[in-house]
Amino acid sequence: MIVLGLTGSIGMGKSTAARMFRAMGVPVHDADATVHDLLVHDRQVHSDISARFPGTVNGNLVDRQALGVAVFGDPAARRDLEAILHPRVRQAAKRFLRKHRVLGTPLVVLD
């Protein structure tokens, strides 16, 4: 299986390239979508974020704007948020790759 990774800065066309691969039927793992899903559905993520960034989780909803204010511009806070999210994103990517290896998918994209 060929694993193609899309990398680059903001505005470099990664999302456009991912859409093109999807249109050709190539499975694409979208790390941004995984983060969004974690922020919406993962209760442990909610708990971890609430503990580290008080006032950013209301009930079962992460206030993304409040979290952004707490994190961006503060490198240590950003690293703390990444420490909560990145291991889970890596696990999701590993599950995606395992699934497609079993299926015999010839090409997948990690975005």
Name the predicted role of every residue range.
Residues 33-107:
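ATP-dependent small-molecule kinase phosphotransfer cores
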Residues 4-6:
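Hydrophobic anchor at the beta1->P-loop junction of P-loop NTPases
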Residues 1:
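Short coil/loop residues immediately preceding or within conserved phosphate-binding loops
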Residues 15:
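Walker A/P-loop
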Residues 10:
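The conserved Walker
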Residues 109-111:
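Structural recognition of the conserved hydrophobic beta-strand(s) that form the central parallel beta-sheet
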Residues 22-31, 43-44:
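Post-Walker A helix-loop "phosphate-sensing" segment adjacent to the P-loop in P-loop NTPases
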